[in-house]
Amino acid sequence: MGASISSNVTKLVTDAIVRTSNEVVQTAHATNNQSIVFDVKNTSGDVVISGNTIRQTATINMVGLSQALNNSDNNIKLDQQIAQMAKAVISGLNLAQLADANNTVDSLIKTCIEIKNVTTQQCMMNTSQKINVLVEGTKGNVSIVNNEISQLATSIQSCVEKAASNNKNLQDITSSIQQAATSEAKGLSLAMIALIIVAMGLTGVGGVYAGGKIIFPAVLIGSIVSFVLYFQWTVREISSYSFVQNTLSESADCSIQKSSGESDNIGSAKSASEKCQNDNTCVAYEWQNGQAVYYKNMTIGNSCKSYYSNGAHKDTLPVIKKLIFQKGARNPVNTDVANAWLNTLDGSFWVNSDPNVLKYFGGRYGRLPYQTRYLYASGGTYVGDDVNGVGWNQQGSFGKRANRTIDWGDGPPSTITSQAEGDIWVDYHDPSLLKVYTYIAQQGGGFIWQSGQIIKGIGPIVNSNVENSKSVGFAIESKKQWLLYLAIGLLIVGVIGMAFSSGMFSKKNNGKSKQ
């Protein structure tokens, strides 16, 4: 399952970027002096390019597209798309087995966004491929609508795969999700293989079957016991779905009355899942706002289960909060309500490791309960109730020179009206990848802002709120598939062994030799 999770992450990030890229292309209105994505020349009169599948004959400037994707509106839209799609990766997990559902999902979304950032800000910017739509000899506006850029997926996917392979967090998240996956038949288990090898080893080697009259019947008995255990021994698990728009009693596909279940006040969806799993009469549960309803000794229709497994239940969570960047000629203090701080005196970079500052919940911004604190700065490590390091912590320094200024903002330094050699500008448009610019003298005279290093900033604060969203779950009873394989293996060994020990094969060979 680990490989499938990684491939799903690659696919969802690729799909989100391609989808948004195509939206950028579809809504592009290029004129003579606006050619972010398209190259349009000598226009006079309106030109509409519509209804085409653009492949070999038309290309897009990948650098221009990267810049378009990273403007504020497109970037927010892309992050929300990725967050929404990432929820599908954990759909159907057993919440009772997931150590920390909130942190796992938040980390998954954050990692996907980090992969997206590397793709759109580094890989695509360095891609030499240019996909241009060239329109000549026209005047007026040019509208490009209802076109499909099929080459985008191939170019973008290679960038996403490279970014994903270099992301260390993805491996940890994959392992966590894999452990929470509902059990399925995995094929031959090591225990089953070992038992078969032992059974075969007892028969002897080199055609000597000492004690076969005792051993092989025992092997056959073992086969029978394995068959019986296979049909009688089941494993009970709960397949859970979070972020649901409608609970079981709210869904028209389920036709279940809430009054038909047993209500219970319980703190989280995970606890509700565990309680249902431990009750053999519980076939399904729903949970919302601290209250669970358990449905027992009843049949849940396939249309109800399909409603959730097919994804029609999804809501609009999670929330990705826009980070607040502030600055001042001093170090930050606790009363400074922000996520990041630049000391303009010494160039030090500070992060507030308490995301409760201005975190979105309940329809407003405020502070979340203390026990749900996370340390998102530089890695998104969950710290639970540990207060160490909560608050402002220095993350690093941008290396400010004496008697020179340093500043930051949401975009490149072209907005600065006055600058001097050695000044530094930090672009926090993408909070997780901060771009550092230095004002330098260029050969031949004049000065330019030179883009230098890209350093790790602070990742997005994601409030997936898994265990506080609506949740439902279904009881699943699965058989130990390896027992079936063991029974079949022992049966084969026992039958063949009995045949050898009875001399069946030797009698046939003797009969042939006499003829």
From Swiss-Prot:
Q: What is its main location?
A: membrane
Lipid link (N-myristoyl glycine) located at?
G2
Q: Does Magnesium show up as a keyword for this record?
A: no
Q: Where in the cell is it found?
A: Membrane
TM stretches of this protein = 188-208, 214-234, 482-502
Q: Which Pfam families match?
A: L1R_F9L
> Which keywords describe this protein according to UniProt?
Lipoprotein, Membrane, Myristate, Transmembrane, Transmembrane helix
InterPro entries reported for this sequence: Virion_mem_poxvirus_L1
For this record, the Gene Ontology CC terms, alphabetical, are: membrane
> Which superkingdom?
Viruses
How does this protein lie in the membrane?
Answer: Multi-pass membrane protein
UniProt keyword DNA-binding, yes or no:
no
What's this protein's family per the entry? Belongs to the IIV-6 118L/458R family.
What name appears for this protein in its UniProt entry? Putative myristoylated protein 118L
Q: Which organism is it from?
A: Invertebrate iridescent virus 6
